[in-house]
Amino acid sequence: MIALLPFILSLAATFINIFLCVTNISKRYSINLNILFWVIIFISFFIVRSNFSNDFLMDFATPFISLDEFSFCFGVVLSALMIIFLISSFYSDDEKFYKQEMFALASLAGFGLLAMSLSVELILTLIFLEVASISIYAMIAMNSIEYKSVEAAFKYFLLSSFMSAFYLLGAAFVFGVAGSTKYSFIATGLNSDFLSIIGMILVLSMMFFKIAIFGFYRWSIDVYYGSNLNIAGFLASAFKLASFAILIKLCFLYPGNNIEILQGIFAILAILSMFAGNLLSLKETNVKKILIAAGIVHSGYIFINLSSVGASVSIYPAIFYLSTYTIVVGFLFAILNGLFGDREIKISDLNGLYKVRPTEAFAFTVICLSFIGFPYSVGFLGKLFIFSSAVESGKTYLAIFGIINTIFSVYYYLKIIISIYFSENKTALSCADSKKFGLKLLALSSILFIILEGSGIFSIISFLNLFIR
């Protein structure tokens, strides 16, 4: 029973939050309680991994849920992202939005994403994905005073419904050929015929949609922009992490006969995503939209490694980049939420930020430099691993395209940094003085993570490997 401890604890936290909806619990106590829940869930992963071998956890209790090394890594990072999301909720003055119902939905979404990353079966994966998605629709729409939030929720719901139908059709094709919907059976049961390839593409298209890769990204601009800033950060970090987790497990933990065909598709998506994301970012002046479009570029970087995995190249660069990128994005949206609340943020709103909030301004700068790939930052290390994997696999052209797009991204990230340090401040910040200290701690945490991880003093993957036996 202890091997399923993280799964059970996250489910219990969800039920407790639902029961608390009928009480008059304050926002402060609700946030503190949920942070405690997710800290316990975070610790439970290490308890489980320390007490059981990998072979035992791969086959424990159920053929549908597995706490392998990949699930362990993604589960730990997802728990950390939930904690960052909850801490960020402290710094919003919108009491009507941050009601207990919102935290119950957030807990349900966290459970769905966590369970999804543990799943090794197609139908169960979709069920947990829908649990998380339905919660997100409601969380986006809860900001009902904003017309764009209701529009964003409806658009996300409608498009997700279509993609779920495609996923189920693909799962039916896969079952018809492989005779099972378990990942391990799919890997050995599928062949290179037309039905197998179409089935896998339809299944993976759902993940492409949630990740917002090229061809599936148009929704993300409107939905993220129409969402509360904190919810947008949750989508850009936790939801993207869980979607990539399924993609990686399905394609690489259980590699099948069609992996070469899929990797060719991944290479095309990587190139198109990097260029499309940069083109969208270059013309934007809205900070949230820049970050949304830049997320498409970073997904493209991860796809470089996914298209390069082979005998001499591991999936490690993609896992490292995904884990560190989503944590940094979580920190960034949390800091922005603390500084500006839920109002629209133009680049000009960052003018002279260093004069009034030097710690947060420096954190914002370090994050932007990390996204560029500045040396001794975690972004530099991630890009080094990603581009090296492409070269080692013989796909040097992908590394070249990646470097070109990294150079393009310098323009809009430097635009933000220049605005912070070389322009006069004209806009009041929303964070109250009483909340400055906590926000500074959040900013300092992001700086330490980026520098310590990037300089090699601390490695999240090496640390997690200590618990993998």
UniProtKB/Swiss-Prot annotation:
GO terms for cellular component: plasma membrane. It is a multi-pass membrane protein. The chain crosses the membrane at residues 2-22, 28-48, 70-90, 101-121, 122-142, 157-177, 194-214, 233-253, 261-281, 290-310, 315-335, 361-381, 398-418, 447-467. GO terms for biological process: ATP synthesis coupled electron transport. Coiled coil: none annotated. NDH-1 shuttles electrons from NADH, via FMN and iron-sulfur (Fe-S) centers, to quinones in the respiratory chain. The immediate electron acceptor for the enzyme in this species is believed to be ubiquinone. Couples the redox reaction to proton translocation (for every two electrons transferred, four hydrogen ions are translocated across the cytoplasmic membrane), and thus conserves the redox energy in a proton gradient. This is NADH-quinone oxidoreductase subunit N.
